[in-house]
Every structure is written in C-alpha cells, then in structure tokens.
C-alpha cells in the first residue's frame, strides 16, 4: 500500500454503509436461481460461516463471475468491494448501487473505502475482498496484497476463506449446452494476530501470506500458484 491518497470518486458510496441496498435481496434470489440452473453448483463447509459476527469473505479471483457466485451463497448479507472503474458501465453501476457495494480505487490508499469496510465489519456485516487485487490469468494464486490485512486488523474482524473453482468454465460449457461444475470450499474462519500492537507493513504482508496459505490449502495443487 502506498501513502498516496486515492482521488475521490464522483459516484456515491453511501449504499454500502448506511444499509441502503434496495435490490440486494432480489439480486441474491436471481443469482441463486441462475447458477442453480446453469451450473452444477456446490458449497462445501457452509458451517464455517460466522452466525452473527462481522467478517471478511476472502476469495481467490479467477473469473469475473467469482463475486456473483459467492455473495448469494453464504446465508449472510455480503457487501462486495469492486474496483471503481466498474462504474463506467451503466448496467454494472446500476447493480453496484442497488446491491450496496463499496467501490475501491486500486493502487492507492483508498481511505473512504477502508473506512466504509471497517464500519461495515464493526457493525456486524460482511465484506468480500480478493486479496490478490486482480484476476489470476493462470488460475493459480498470485501474491496477495496487504490491503485486506490492513482492514482486518483495523476492524479486528474474522476472515472466512472461500476457495472458488470452476467459474472460468461456465460460459464455455453453456456454449456446448452443458453445465460446468462450480465449487465453493469454505475454510474455518480465523482472526489475524498482531500481538496487540499496531501492524507494520512487513507484518501486514506476513499476515497476508499466512492467509493466502490457508486459501491454498483449500485448493487443488494446480491452483495454489505461488503458495504451493
């Protein structure tokens, strides 16, 4: 993370932290139906989802569908954190605002996004973060960035690792009139330990790597990437 403040977006972010997500329930129901019909969908380890406490949903990122598969599937309301560039698409902007998302400026310290995510977690909500910061081109894990660890330690939040498999196969399978197998494997929720002090950047990276290794343990070896 750099120390350069992120420029303010002209788009409203209020929906993510004040509870104004008018179509979240509708979108979740629609997404569940779509994936039930178009894929062979399975969630393993649903018992690991925290019942009431705020938590971070940590995902590996292998396809644009990843957040859409995860957010309706955990039995808890989850706030995604998409890149702010997604607002440039009118349709995606409609979804982001009405679902209730926290847009993030990538590459800089986005203090507003950090504050909104922290507030959401402290109020008992859940946010979805891909610590890799971008999609993996190979399907294997790439090095995690410390932004998730910064938010997790600031909010003292639980982290639920969710390993995604199969999303890149969805559209190719549909073209052949088949349904791809899509699997979410949930690990045990954990909390990052800073030893009671403020985490340095080196410690944040260490905590990030530890979290990514937990993610790797939920994936087949071929998808563990730099965390084999």
Residue ranges and their predicted role:
Residues 28-29, 36, 49-108, 116:
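Catalytic core of membrane glycerolipid acyltransferases/transacylases, capturing the structured
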Residues 36-44, 165-168:
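Short gly/ser/thr-rich secondary-structure transition/capping motifs
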Residues 46, 60, 83, 107, ...:
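Generic beta-structure capping elements
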Residues 39, 107-110, 141:
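A conditional alpha-helix N-cap/helix-loop micro-motif detector
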Residues 43, 80, 101-103, 159-161, ...:
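Conserved beta-strand scaffold positions in the cores of enzyme catalytic domains, especially
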Residues 2-23, 112-228:
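Non-catalytic C-terminal accessory region of glycerolipid acyltransferases
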Residues 47-50, 176-177:
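A short beta-turn/loop motif at secondary-structure boundaries
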């Amino acid at each position: 993370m750099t120390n350069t403040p992120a420029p303010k977006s002209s788009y409203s972010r209020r929906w993510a932290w004040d509870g104004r997500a008018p179509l979240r329930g509708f979108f979740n129901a629609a997404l569940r139906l779509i994936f039930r019909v178009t894929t062979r969908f399975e969630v393993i380890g649903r018992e690991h989802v925290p019942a009431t406490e705020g938590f971070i949903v940590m995902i590996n990122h292998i396809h644009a569908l990843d957040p859409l598969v995860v957010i309706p599937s955990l039995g808890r309301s989850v706030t995604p954190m998409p890149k702010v560039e997604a607002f440039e698409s009118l349709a995606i902007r409609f979804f982001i605002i009405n679902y209730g998302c926290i847009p993030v400026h990538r590459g800089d310290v986005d203090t507003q996004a950090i504050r909104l995510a922290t507030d959401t977690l402290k109020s008992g909500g859940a946010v979805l973060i891909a610590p890799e910061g971008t999609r993996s081109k190979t399907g294997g894990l790439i090095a995690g960035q410390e932004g998730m660890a910064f938010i997790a330690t600031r909010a003292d939040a639980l982290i639920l690792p969710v390993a995604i498999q199969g999303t890149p196969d969805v559209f190719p399978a549909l073209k052949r009139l088949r349904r791809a197998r899509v699997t979410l494997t949930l690990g045990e929720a954990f909390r990052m330990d800073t030893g009671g002090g403020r985490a340095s950047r080196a410690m944040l990276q260490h905590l990030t790597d530890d979290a990514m290794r937990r993610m790797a343990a939920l994936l087949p070896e071929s998808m563990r990437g730099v965390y084999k």
